[in-house]
Amino acid sequence: MPTPLTVVAAIIENEHGQLLIAERPPNKAWAGYWEFPGGKIEPGESHEAALLRELREELGLNLAGETLTHYYHGNRGAEVILDFYHIRLTRDIAPQSLEGQRWRWVSRAEITDYRFPEPNAAVLQKLQNASA
């Protein structure tokens, strides 16, 4: 059985309680859907190091020094493991679209207005329950 692919994503929350989401680019699976920024773990990389690297590569964010709190762990069959980390910002940040994707800050209530890939359903439900 092949080793599952591990994907890490950041639920980045600003000082106004808004969450950062990014639109998946046209050349990727789930194109046009929205997601929490992140990506694949490289061999020998920790979850946290991979997430910080992906945030730098995709959005030009240097979040070293911010606290990453594990928020959710899920499996998509046997092929993919999803790990989400919550980052509550202690300073203003300005994401950039380094890979051409759109991004925006949304409230927890607004998040249901966006289409997310099906594997994100459980973490979205957890976010909705936390805001109720």
Language-model region placement:
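Active-site-adjacent beta-strand/loop module that shapes the phosphate/pyrophosphate-binding cleft
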Residues: 5, 14, 71-94, 102-106, ...
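A generic structural signal for short hydrophobic patches within well-formed alpha-helices
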Residues: 41, 111-112, 124
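A residue-level structural signature of the nucleotidyltransferase/glycosyltransferase Rossmann-like core
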Residues: 18-19, 103, 116
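Conserved Nudix-box catalytic region and its N-terminal flanking loop in Nudix hydrolases
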Residues: 18-57
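C-terminal structural segments of small proteins and small subunits
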Residues: 108-119
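Conserved N-terminal beta-strand and adjoining loop/helix that marks the start
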Residues: 1-19, 40, 71
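Charged phosphate-binding loop/patch that engages nucleotide di/tri-phosphates or the phosphate backbone
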Residues: 119-132
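A short coil-to-beta-strand element that immediately follows conserved catalytic motifs
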Residues: 62-71
